[in-house]
Amino acid sequence: MKVISSIQELRDQLRGQNRTAFVPTMGNLHEGHLSLMRLARQHGDPVVASIFVNRLQFGPNEDFDKYPRTLQEDIEKLQKENVYVLFAPTERDMYPEPQEYRVQPPHDLGDILEGEFRPGFFTGVCTVVTKLMACVQPRVAVFGKKDYQQLMIVRRMCQQLALPVEIVAAETVRDADGLALSSRNRYLSEAERAEAPELAKTLARVRDAVLDGERDLAAIERRAVAHLSARGWQPDYVSIRRRENLVAPSAAQIEAGDPLVVLTAAKLGATRLIDNLEI
């Protein structure tokens, strides 16, 4: 595996490749990330991964400085997955001058849910993903359903900007107790880690309520928020949306069997966790 930080060197290395499968990450790789590499291999060859902690998608009071950076361990994991190139640029490589041009998602997708609680987050994501796509020029890129809203936004962005990249969605990987794998799980104390699976269990109860025929979605959401709050969580939202566009469904759409998803974000202690479950 070649480890490259220069954009020009990356382009030189990938020249002539027309079936590249790309997996962008921020590093601190776990089994969830590695499953993305394996899925990428099913859709293209060679597989290119990137590791870049993107300052643009962190707010002023978020964890950019303490976000775990484990490059050497990540390199060893990617080598075992037979990744062809790891693109690991420095901030100077990616942003040699101030990034004045930004890619901003539409308000209906970018300013709801995560976008409401993390202003500017998806503009940072779309900007860096677009720039990475321009550097790698993949045929396929793999994104996890764990970041469901991000997946929807990137997919729509590629469609509307006519980027010649197929976006492949990967299922969320979970620990045996149901907790979705996340680099931020390492922030949890022992007691918090024991409590953390309750987030996925809460989503399962929401799903079951909808599948059992309950139609007052707002009441289901309020019940879930109250349940988490009573257990010491600080929920930002529990929200049932249409999978297609993350719009809140109407009663008629629910009855018609529109595919739904329930999404949540909540703090446990100082750690903010997100999760979702398709219904």
From Swiss-Prot:
Enzyme class of the recorded protein, top EC level: ligase
Gene3D superfamilies in alphabetical order: HUPs, Pantoate-beta-alanine ligase, C-terminal domain
Cellular localization per UniProt: Cytoplasm
Catalytic activity: (R)-pantoate + beta-alanine + ATP = (R)-pantothenate + AMP + diphosphate + H(+)
Keywords: ATP-binding, Cytoplasm, Ligase, Nucleotide-binding, Pantothenate biosynthesis
GO terms, molecular function: ATP binding; pantoate-beta-alanine ligase activity
Positions of the catalytic residues: H33
Domain of life: Bacteria
Binding site for beta-alanine: Q57
Ligase is among the record's keywords: yes
InterPro entries membership: Cyt_trans-like, Pantoate_ligase, Pantoate_ligase_C, Rossmann-like_a/b/a_fold
One Pfam family, short name: Pantoate_ligase
NCBIfam families to which the protein is assigned, alphabetical: cyt_tran_rel, panC
Misc. comment: The reaction proceeds by a bi uni uni bi ping pong mechanism.
HAMAP family, per database record: PanC (MF_00158)
Similarity comment text for this entry: Belongs to the pantothenate synthetase family.
Annotated protein name in UniProt: Pantothenate synthetase
Gene: panC
